[in-house]
Amino acid sequence: MDLARVHTPRGWYDDFVNRLVNCARCPRLVSYRSTVKPLRRYESWSYWGRPVPPWGDLNARVMVVGLAPAAHGGNRTGRMFTGDASAQNLFKALFLLGLSNKPYSVSRDDGVEVRCVYITSAVKCAPPKNRPTAEEVYNCSSWLREELEAVRPRAVVALGELAWRAVLKILGATTAAFKHGEVVNAAGVRVYASYHPSPLNVNTGRLTVETLAEVLRRAAADAGCL
């Protein structure tokens, strides 16, 4: 895959989102995403319940790739890494580096702006128990491939093993074992591995905001963002 860097047109992004939100390739995900029962604290919300669009700086040099939208996060708010605990951990780290203007991400109208960073996921719909099937990951791979070709990042930070494997496969790299802090060069892109900023990983001490920020810092520095 040739990922020579060029300007990413706004027209591509708008067209991409319009196509993405109407995707119905995976019957299990279509059924689940639209029938998630709101948590009590979100009973007043009208859940998004569709494929969740990526967002960020369209001229980004760093692409952050997560697993999939959270049922009560992106699937509720309609924006990836927005409205759940994983999102808050990620944005605390981005804020520490000056890559986000706020240390949180709670809704599409929260005024958050990121610099040099584009945020997306390997799977675009919330999966039951946060576990997409191999077929669902494959079905979504064409979306992520299109994003990589359009945005042409210099660095990718893969949050979690599934995102790591999905990115490397699209870039045509020999799959390297997932290890936090690992770096692989593939198709002219430096791909960084990080544990996912989930509450489980943070609460057990496997990952901290600081160790996540360090991986992001290395990627951003290598990409020329810092």
Curated annotation (Swiss-Prot):
EC number(s) recorded for this UniProt protein: 3.2.2.-
Biological process according to GO: base-excision repair; DNA repair
Source organism, top-level taxon: Archaea
Key words of the record: 4Fe-4S, DNA damage, DNA repair, Hydrolase, Iron, Iron-sulfur, Metal-binding
Protein name, entry field: Type-5 uracil-DNA glycosylase
Similarity-based family: Belongs to the uracil-DNA glycosylase (UDG) superfamily. Type 5 (UDGb) family.
InterPro entries per UniProt: UDG_Type-4/5 (IPR051536), UdgB-like (IPR044147), Uracil-DNA_glycosylase-like (IPR005122), Uracil-DNA_glycosylase-like_sf (IPR036895)
Residues binding [4Fe-4S] cluster, per UniProt: C23, C26, C125, C140
Record-level Gene Ontology MF annotations: 4 iron, 4 sulfur cluster binding; deaminated base DNA N-glycosylase activity; DNA-deoxyinosine glycosylase activity; metal ion binding; uracil DNA N-glycosylase activity
Alphabetical list of Pfam families matching this protein: UDG
Effect caused by changing A68D: 10-fold decrease in activity
Annotated function: DNA glycosylase with broad substrate specificity. Can remove uracil from double-stranded DNA containing either a U/G or U/A base pair. Can also process hydroxymethyluracil (mispaired with guanine or adenine), hypoxanthine and fluorouracil. Exhibits a clear preference for double-stranded DNA substrates, but can also process uracil in single-stranded DNA, with lower efficiency.
Stored CDD domains: UDG-F5_TTUDGB_like
Temperature dependence as stated in the record: Thermostable.
